[in-house]
Swiss-Prot record:
Extra remark beyond the main annotation: The gamma-gliadins can be divided into 3 homology classes. Sequence divergence between the classes is due to single-base substitutions and to duplications or deletions within or near direct repeats.
Stretches the record annotates as Disordered: 26-143
Compositional bias of kind Pro residues: 82-99
Designated name of the protein: Gamma-gliadin
Pfam families (alphabetical): Gliadin
Organism: Triticum aestivum (Wheat)
Entry keywords, A to Z: Repeat, Seed storage protein, Signal, Storage protein
CDD domains: AAI_SS (cd00261)
Length: 251
């Protein structure tokens, strides 16, 4: 209301001043003496200056922060550029170059099929192996004894080969059952011959007896074994012949 009153007073003063200027030009000198005219300028400058700058604080803060944020998605579009050059360049040169030269390896497998022909000839070497134990027996040499002593020891050798056991029976009973048996005669001869041999040579003589008995038993066993091995060896030779025929068929 104050502002309206001030405006009306100013309008009335202006109209009165203009009317006086038109009527009396000499009255222009009296206008500077009137001081109440510049007073209405003070409320106009005080009241609106305080209210109008307040809304200016809200507008620059809010919109300025929100608009630069949408610039972030521009970084995400640059990422897909990395996987496209990396993936296709690596697998294409590596894979096709390696498998093609590997197909040349099956050419080596064909000459390997000739190896089974050598395996059939191997069993031929194994058959004469049973003859090897014959070499070990003659290596055992008896101690050297004079031929005269060997003849003296022969009754003891014969006594042992007959497997007589006069010690297990009482001498009286033995004489009653077999008064003059072969074992008793050979035992007496052996004792007589050993008594004639010097004591230094008795051990060597007994050793020769035992060694000769062992050699005779081994020879008998070998002869019996040869009778058994000969038919087996013949069967093996027949089997080798069939294998050779089979090789000819395979070839």
């Amino acid at each position: 209301m104050k502002t309206l009153l001030i405006l009306t007073i100013l309008a009335m003063a202006i109209t009165i001043g203009t009317a006086n200027m038109q009527v009396d030009p000499s009255s222009q000198v009296q206008w500077p003496q009137q001081q109440p005219v510049p007073q209405p300028h003070q409320p106009f400058s005080q009241q609106p200056q305080q209210t109008f700058p307040q809304p200016q604080q809200t507008f620059p803060h809010q919109p300025q922060q929100q608009f630069p944020q949408p610039q972030q998605p521009q970084q995400q579009f640059l990422q897909p550029q990395q996987p496209f050059p990396q993936q296709p360049q690596q697998p294409y040169p590596q894979q096709p170059q390696q498998p093609f030269p590997q197909t040349q390896q099956p050419q080596q497998l064909f000459p390997q099929s000739q190896q089974p022909q050598q395996q059939f000839s191997q069993p031929q070497q194994q058959f004469p192996q049973p003859q090897q134990p014959q070499q070990s027996f003659p290596q055992q040499q008896p101690p050297f004894i004079q031929p005269s002593l060997q003849q003296q020891v022969n009754p003891c050798k014969n006594f042992l080969l007959q497997q007589c056991k006069p010690v297990s029976l009482v001498s009286s009973l033995w004489s009653m059952i077999w008064p003059q048996s072969d074992c008793q005669v050979m035992r007496q001869q052996c004792c007589q011959q050993l008594a004639q041999i010097p004591q230094q040579l008795q051990c060597a003589a007994i050793h020769t007896i035992i060694h000769s008995i062992i050699m005779q038993q081994e020879q008998q066993e070998q002869q019996q074994g040869m009778h058994i091995l000969l038919p087996l060896y013949q069967q093996q030779q027949v089997g080798q012949g069939t294998l050779v025929q089979g090789q000819g068929i395979i070839q």
